[in-house]
Amino acid sequence: MKRLWSAFIKLLVLAVIGGALLAAIAILAANRQLPSLDALTAFRHTPDYVPIGKIPRELTGAVVAIEDERFYVHDGIDYIGVVRAGVANLSDELSQGASTITMQVARNFYLSRDKTYTRKLYEVLLSYRIEKALTKDEILELYMNKIYLGQGAYGFADAARTYFGKRLDQLTLAECAMLAGLPKAPSANNPVANPRRARQRQVYILQRMLELGRISRGEYDGALLEPLRLR
């Protein structure tokens, strides 16, 4: 029995070492095939690109609160967020994702939507590379300009015009929260296609902003009372 146990331990150690070596080889191979970040630089010079300084803080605050509340402290992959999302999705709470804003930038610029281990590996490696090359505000800026938000709108400036007929600097807190709820499911959650779900998402985001100290109780109450006025 003792010999069998010893043999099992040896096989287990060999399996772990072998798995680690295979993982290292896969990572090295994937690293060599990663694209350059030139596409990000080029996109920042497109005519309709909106710099972060011209995006309302209420809007960036709402987006970070719902999409990636640890955005400014993680290195592209939020391991705490992965665990929290798993717990939330097993409970009765609104479902949460584990993709960070950086991972979404990597996916939106470079990758397909295929749910494969290879694509996920590229997404993780690209996220680390993006984090090393750009500041957090630059990454958030790219996200705010690129993300699809339903009704043919790409980026929050386009979405503000599409849904409310406004410029970004004209948005109210309630409208910012409404738009921030779109990235998760832009076709299903937008106020044109499904006002009830859009409202539910808006309220949840305002609650998160209040809990995180991004807005005051008065701002929260005022935003809840504001009627929805689409263009």
UniProtKB/Swiss-Prot annotation:
Pfam family, one: Transgly
Pathway where this protein functions: Cell wall biogenesis; peptidoglycan biosynthesis
A single MF term (Gene Ontology): peptidoglycan glycosyltransferase activity
UniProt organism field: Cupriavidus necator (strain ATCC 17699 / DSM 428 / KCTC 22496 / NCIMB 10442 / H16 / Stanier 337)
Enzyme class name: transferase
Family: Belongs to the glycosyltransferase 51 family.
Function description: Cell wall formation.
InterPro entries: Glyco_trans_51 (IPR001264), Glycosyltr_51/Transpeptidase (IPR050396), Lysozyme-like_dom_sf (IPR023346), PBP_transglycosylase (IPR036950)
Name of the protein in its database record: Putative transglycosylase H16_A0665
Ranges annotated as spanning the membrane: 8-28
